């Protein structure tokens, strides 16, 4: 089983899209990336820095959930089995996005999204 960085999901509670662009595009100099049409309904802007994509959530009503790092794997079932076998809780109860995925936290509370490789 292999894993690779996929994206980082960052939080911008209460920020407008213009506020988010002002920092990530204008100040940091990241390129705004187009998210897939299937995600158009989600209040998230995408920015790229080389091969890393930042997903920045900005709903005006606040954020539901936590920020996370996402890792893509060539064997989602093996990854899930490894975490469970090592005693880590796997959360499959996530908002449906049209592809299988799960979340897991490290012992210090940092959250990781584990998803199949090949997704935008």
Put a short name on every predicted segment.
Residues 14, 74-77:
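Helix N-cap motif at beta-to-alpha junctions
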Residues 32-34, 55-56, 89-92:
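A short linear hydrophobic-aromatic micro-motif
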Residues 9-52:
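Core segments of cupin and vicinal oxygen chelate
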Residues 1-3, 86-120:
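Vicinal oxygen chelate
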Residues 44, 53, 70, 101-102, ...:
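Short hydrophobic/aromatic beta-strand element in the GNAT-like acyltransferase core
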Residues 1-21, 67-69, 120:
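N-terminal beta-strand motif that seeds the catalytic metal site of vicinal oxygen chelate
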């Amino acid at each position: 089983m292999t894993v690779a960085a996929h994206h980082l999901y960052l939080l911008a509670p209460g920020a407008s899209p213009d506020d988010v662009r002002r920092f990530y595009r204008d100040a940091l100099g990241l390129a705004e990336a187009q998210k897939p049409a299937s995600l158009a309904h989600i209040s998230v802007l995408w920015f790229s820095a080389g091969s890393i994509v930042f997903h920045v959530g900005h709903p005006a009503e606040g954020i539901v959930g936590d920020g996370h790092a996402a890792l893509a794997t060539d064997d989602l079932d093996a990854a899930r089995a490894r975490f469970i076998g090592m005693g880590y809780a796997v959360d499959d109860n996530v908002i449906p996005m049209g592809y299988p995925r799960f979340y897991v936290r490290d012992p210090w509370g940092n959250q990781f999204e584990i998803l199949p490789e090949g997704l935008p």
